[in-house]
Design a protein with these regions (language model features):
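Catalytic core of pol beta-like nucleotidyltransferases
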Residues: 1-25, 34-39, 50-99
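Glycine-rich beta-strand-to-loop/alpha-helix junction loops that act as flexible
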Residues: 29-31
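Short beta-strand->loop micro-motif that forms the acidic, two-metal-ion catalytic signature
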Residues: 44-48
Length: 99
């Protein structure tokens, strides 16, 4: 992966931490993780949260997308609870296989 993408991801993670978002894991997945990105690819990032029932994940994704726009509009955050992050979940399975 190129340094520029690493820098973008790290900047975004710092931005989220400054907003006091308490995720436990971050996964890069999708085309960038597979090194098959194009000029129009987004940067898929999965964020795993332990506060399973206390978070409205739709509102959280909206907040995370808003913050992403300040760093790089290609960032596509995917917040998930640790409870939902299992091999039985199709999105989690893809993240685990390609992330």
């Amino acid at each position: 992966m190129d340094k520029g993408i690493n820098q973008i991801i790290n900047s975004y993670i710092l931005c989220l931490q400054k907003e006091n978002l308490k995720f436990t894991k971050v996964y890069l997945f999708g085309s960038y993780a597979k090194n098959k990105q194009s000029a129009h690819s987004d940067i898929d990032l999965a964020f795993i949260f332990d506060e399973n029932k206390q978070i409205d994940y739709f509102d959280l994704q909206v907040q995370m997308l808003s913050l992403a726009s300040y760093i790089d509009t290609r960032i596509e955050p995917h917040p998930m609870s640790s409870e939902d992050f299992t091999p039985e979940n199709p999105l989690a399975c893809e993240i685990l296989n390609t992330g």
